[in-house]
């Protein structure tokens, strides 16, 4: 384990003492440090009447137990404090370490002992994570240090788990959205599942906008998958034009219906454990699936501002600006009189995507978004540079396939009976509008691009994204983060995992940092917390995170690619083509081993290469036909230790998100030997070699010069490492599987690689 403590808020001695005393630690500024130390330690064992017993099982040095030390005349030193602090945090001498001082350095222990400031040291110790992944104070509260009295209690600017999760209110309401997406003449109703504690004051809300949450239709999804095999068709040259998105909600008016209490409850809904963490700390949890999902009405419009409006309506209801009904009969309205109107949105992938879309509406009441692996432009999810480009791991998926997956109204037989025929008509229109045949950007995709509305965002923004996420690729967060107004509080966590959550990792106190931020923004805590702009996981060191100021450098390093001509054949023999089409992973493995149709350029680095941003290939090439796909990958090549892209479980049920509530596993990305690592990649339709909106002819056997930007990343390579450039045509995971007989020729002498290298240390 290594500490990267973001969440601790430095405080005054007076505040530290007051907070310690409020928790029952009877320390006093006037008392000697060793006496305060003993009082603090004995309070940790509040389950014991005889606290001598647990103290006797700890040590103060290699030859002295802690109880004996505390009752002796020996002085409290840094060595004693550090050794005891490690044990309090769950580290075991002779098991986790032998030399405490060496171990303190190795793990980056965040507390610097000062006998004159011991109470501040103890205050920080309570706010420091144990080996198990929870802070010492959270561990104590989970054991019953404080009662679950449904009132807010804070420590170091963060809410504690004092809300009773054994007696929660679970209710369902139906919010009226200013939409009629299924064209039935009635405003769409949006089902909202609410879980909230029995608080006596108005409370904020965590809202997860999840089109998956009311169920998914995998059968319909699988039937709708598109065939990847086909021929890349040349497109007529033209300039693509689009109009600004102009979504207009329908008119609504305040309801005059009588107000009633909730008429529908539920016992269970699958939850997100970060929400559970905040539920125990006095935040309501809302799960909303939006239009076209089971329990709601409307059509699944998949990514546009109508879908986003269905989630926005819920925030409007929480603030008294929209109507919610107790049932589909629409005969009683229900008020959110328990809400303080402030909302934070959470969730990964589609869920985080809806957070971004919501933020671009500028809706009042949305205080913070915590968007993980979020899409900012749906075109860039299903397309790339004029090509159909399936998300990593899901060849054949497209937006209409996602619609089939998430249109969960068809999982209700009555809804299927009444509405499926009309749904199929609307789905057919959607399938036509997404222009799969051409791969072009068009108005349909522009209406699902949130980047032009980024200047409307006014809430605090937190993004997390994996630099090995080839599902929702890094360009999605790179573009939205760099489009955000400078006036915003904006924060980005970049890790080296794939499409994964990171709130339960051992090496970074993400949960606690979000606690401090949300208490500041949603509970009025003037805690002085400041979250860095960018927190990046160092790819060269295990469990090490660094603070940066920018994603994307302005300095460029030019790297030559060679001095000869290379030919890349697109066509494969029938057996190989069938094998690769059946298993794209076999294609990837052979591509990385240099066994596919490709050009491979190995570059031995003569100096460190700190990549930050979009690597760019400047290439001179020609195609034997009037079409062509160019794909590229950059690899960190050669055996060495690197991060795996999926977090491993360190300890099951290690993290208690409340008081014996919603336990989850502690995880971390393994750091282990591997033969190579994908640094970045991309695909390009050569007819879009100038820009996305310009379609150009490809003249047969005539040289062209292209600029090809790959996916952005932050990745550091060292002197002596090998950077492998892989250039090829068809990508069996992502692009159309075109086996036609054409070839690309590259003039490497007239080509080069540009690497952005601005970095902060």
Swiss-Prot record:
The keyword Membrane does not apply. Its EC number is 3.4.14.11. GO terms for molecular function: aminopeptidase activity; dipeptidyl-peptidase activity; serine-type peptidase activity. Gene3D superfamilies: 1.10.246.70, alpha/beta hydrolase, Galactose-binding domain-like. One of its GO terms (cellular component) is cytoplasm. InterPro entries: AB_hydrolase_fold, Galactose-bd-like_sf, Pept_S15_Xpro, PepX_N_dom, PepX_N_dom_sf, Xaa-Pro-like_dom, Xaa-Pro_dipept_C, Xaa-Pro_dipeptidyl-ppase/CocE. The keyword Ligase does not apply. It catalyses: Hydrolyzes Xaa-Pro-|- bonds to release unblocked, N-terminal dipeptides from substrates including Ala-Pro-|-p-nitroanilide and (sequentially) Tyr-Pro-|-Phe-Pro-|-Gly-Pro-|-Ile. Pfam families: Peptidase_S15, PepX_C, PepX_N. It is found in: Cytoplasm. One of its GO terms (biological process) is proteolysis. Belongs to the peptidase S15 family. Removes N-terminal dipeptides sequentially from polypeptides having unsubstituted N-termini provided that the penultimate residue is proline. Homodimer. This is Xaa-Pro dipeptidyl-peptidase. It comes from Streptococcus equi subsp. equi (strain 4047).
């Amino acid at each position: 384990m290594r500490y990267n403590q973001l969440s601790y808020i430095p405080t005054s001695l007076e505040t530290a003492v007051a907070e310690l005393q409020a928790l029952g630690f009877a320390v006093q500024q006037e008392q000697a440090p060793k006496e305060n130390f003993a009082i603090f330690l004995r309070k940790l064992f509040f389950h014991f009447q005889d606290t001598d017993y647990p103290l006797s099982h700890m040590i103060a040095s290699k030859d002295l137990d802690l109880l004996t030390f505390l009752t002796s005349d020996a002085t409290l030193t840094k060595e004693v404090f550090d050794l005891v602090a490690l044990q309090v945090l769950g580290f075991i001498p002779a098991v986790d370490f032998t030399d405490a001082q060496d171990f303190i350095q190795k793990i980056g222990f965040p507390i610097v002992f000062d006998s004159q400031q011991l109470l501040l040291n103890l205050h920080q110790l309570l706010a420091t994570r144990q080996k198990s992944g929870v802070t010492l104070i959270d561990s104590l509260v989970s054991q019953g240090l404080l009662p679950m009295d449904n009132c807010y209690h804070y420590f170091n600017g963060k809410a504690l788990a004092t809300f009773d999760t054994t007696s929660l209110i679970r209710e369902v309401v139906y919010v009226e959205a200013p939409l009629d997406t299924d064209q039935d003449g009635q405003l769409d109703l949006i089902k909202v599942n609410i879980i909230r504690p029995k608080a006596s004051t108005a409370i904020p809300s965590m809202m997860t906008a999840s089109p998956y949450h009311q169920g998914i239709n995998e059968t319909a999804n699988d039937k709708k998958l598109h065939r990847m095999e086909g021929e890349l068709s040349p497109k007529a040259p033209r300039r693509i034009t689009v109009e600004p998105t102009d979504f207009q909600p329908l008119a609504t008016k305040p309801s005059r219906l009588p107000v009633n209490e909730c008429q529908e409850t539920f016992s269970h809904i699958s939850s997100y454990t970060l929400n559970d963490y905040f539920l125990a700390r006095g935040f309501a949890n809302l799960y909303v699936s939006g239009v076209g999902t089971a329990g709601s009405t409307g059509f699944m419009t998949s990514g546009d501002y109508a879908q986003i409006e269905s989630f926005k309506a819920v925030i409007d209801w929480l603030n008294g600006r929209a109507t919610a009904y107790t049932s589909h009969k629409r005969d009683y309205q229900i008020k959110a009189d328990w809400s303080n109107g402030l909302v934070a949105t959470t969730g990964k992938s589609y869920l985080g995507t809806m957070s971004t879309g919501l933020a671009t509406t500028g809706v009042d009441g949305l205080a913070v978004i915590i968007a993980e692996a979020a899409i900012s432009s749906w075109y860039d999810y299903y397309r790339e540079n004029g090509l159909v480009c399936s998300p990593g791991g899901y060849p054949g998926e497209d937006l209409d396939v996602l619609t089939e997956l998430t249109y969960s109204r068809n999982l209700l037989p009555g809804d299927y009976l009444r509405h499926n025929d009309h749904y199929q008509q609307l789905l057919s229109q959607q399938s036509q509008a997404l222009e799969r045949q051409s791969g072009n950007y068009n108005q349909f995709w522009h209406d699902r691009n949130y980047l032009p509305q980024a200047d409307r965002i006014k809430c605090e923004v937190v993004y997390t994204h994996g630099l090995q996420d080839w599902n929702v690729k890094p360009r999605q967060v790179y573009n939205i983060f760099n489009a955000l107004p400078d006036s915003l509080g904006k924060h980005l966590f970049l890790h080296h995992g794939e499409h994964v959550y990171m709130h339960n990792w051992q090496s970074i106190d993400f949960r606690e940092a979000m606690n401090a931020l949300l208490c500041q923004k949603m509970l009025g805590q003037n805690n002085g917390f400041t979250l860095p702009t960018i927190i990046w996981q160092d790819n060269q060191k295990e469990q090490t995170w660094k603070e940066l100021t920018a994603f994307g450098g302005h300095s460029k390093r030019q790297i030559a690619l060679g001095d000869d001509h290379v030919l890349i054949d697109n066509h494969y023999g029938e057996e190989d083509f069938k094998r690769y089409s059946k298993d794209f992973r076999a294609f990837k493995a052979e591509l990385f081993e240099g066994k596919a149709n490709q050009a491979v350029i190995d570059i031995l680095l003569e100096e460190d290469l700190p990549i930050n941003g979009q690597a760019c290939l400047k290439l001179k090439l020609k195609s034997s036909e009037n079409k062509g796909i160019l794909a590229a990958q950059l690899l960190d090549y050669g055996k060495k230790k690197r991060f795996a892209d999926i977090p491993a479980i360190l300890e099951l049920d290690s993290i208690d998100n409340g008081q014996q509530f919603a336990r989850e596993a502690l995880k971390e990305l393994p750091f282990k030997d591997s033969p190579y690592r994908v640094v970045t990649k991309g695909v390009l339709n050569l007819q879009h070699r100038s820009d996305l909106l310009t379609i150009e002819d490809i003249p047969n056997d005539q040289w062209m010069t292209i600029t090809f930007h790959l996916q952005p990343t932050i990745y550091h390579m060292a002197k002596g490492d090998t950077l492998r450039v892989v250039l090829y045509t068809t990508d069996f995971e992502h692009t159309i599987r075109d086996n036609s007989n054409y070839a690309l020729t590259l003039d490497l002498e007239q080509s080069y690689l540009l690497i952005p290298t601005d970095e902060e240390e």
